[in-house]
Design a protein with these regions (language model features):
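N-terminal metal-binding scaffold of metallo-dependent hydrolase/deaminase domains
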Residues: 1-43
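Divalent metal-coordination and catalytic microenvironments
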Residues: 15, 31, 52, 63, ...
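Active-site metal-binding motif and surrounding structural segment of the metallo-beta-lactamase
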Residues: 39-56
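Hydrophobic faces of well-ordered beta-strands that scaffold small-molecule active sites
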Residues: 58-62, 121-123, 150-156, 183-185
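Active-site gating loops and adjacent loop-to-helix segments of metal-dependent hydrolytic enzymes
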Residues: 69-102, 179, 203-205
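Histidine/acidic residue-rich metal-binding segments in metalloenzymes
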Residues: 134-148, 164-205
Length: 205
């Protein structure tokens, strides 16, 4: 028996589900799990053999920085080992960002994540007066390119501060208008407790 010739249908044969001792055949349609049987007699255009390996829901990575991925190859050494120096080094790198390089590095990271079972990512992307909206636009482009294999949520992230880094508040509004999903914050980056408090207030406005 054959199922309808739907290119979105998939049968994964010989897959072990958590808690089961016997491998099963799994039927998926339109990207969603439908049913399983120990020996599914139907056939499908697309079939995979899991080889008796465990089949579980994919993983979620809720905190990643795709705009900074793979920058270690060109970054200076963090001799102090502190967050402050790491941010300073990142700031220097940011001045030389290009859209093509950002998309390439983000893509490498997305493919690596998916190949290891991660299909949902939340990425923070710097928004400030150094890189402007270039990193955001590049990551939005990467999200579109890889939308068939990963769900990517984008956080507009004011790492250099909202008050300390002039113009960032306006850039954050523009980032949300252009496709960022979440407003991020980093009150630590401000110069005083009062400014950190105001930073938090702005994020929730």
């Amino acid at each position: 028996m054959s199922m309808q010739d739907n290119s979105e249908d998939l049968i994964v044969r010989n897959a072990l589900l958590r808690g089961d001792a016997q491998a099963r055949d799994l039927f998926m349609s339109n990207g969603k799990y439908v049913s399983s049987e120990e020996d599914l007699s139907a056939s499908c255009i697309r079939e995979l053999d899991a080889g008796g390996k465990l089949c579980i829901p994919s993983f979620i990575d809720p905190h990643i920085h795709l705009d900074k991925a793979h920058t270690i190859v060109s970054a200076k050494s963090n001799r102090s080992g502190t967050l402050a120096e790491a941010i300073k080094i990142g700031l220097e790198l940011k001045r030389n960002y290009t859209s093509d390089d950002l998309v390439k590095r983000a893509g490498q990271t997305i493919v690596a994540a998916v190949s290891n079972g991660v299909t949902h990512l939340r990425t923070h992307v710097d928004v400030d007066n150094v890189g402007g909206l270039l990193p955001l636009k590049a990551i939005l482009k990467a999200r579109n390119i890889y939308s068939d294999i990963v769900d990517l949520q984008i956080v507009a992230f004011p790492q250099e501060g909202l008050l300390k880094n002039m113009g960032t508040v306006d850039l954050m509004w523009k980032a949300m208008e252009q496709g960022a999903d979440v407003v991020g914050g980093m009150p630590f980056s401000e110069d005083s407790t009062e400014e950190s408090t105001r930073h938090i207030q702005i994020v929730f406005e």
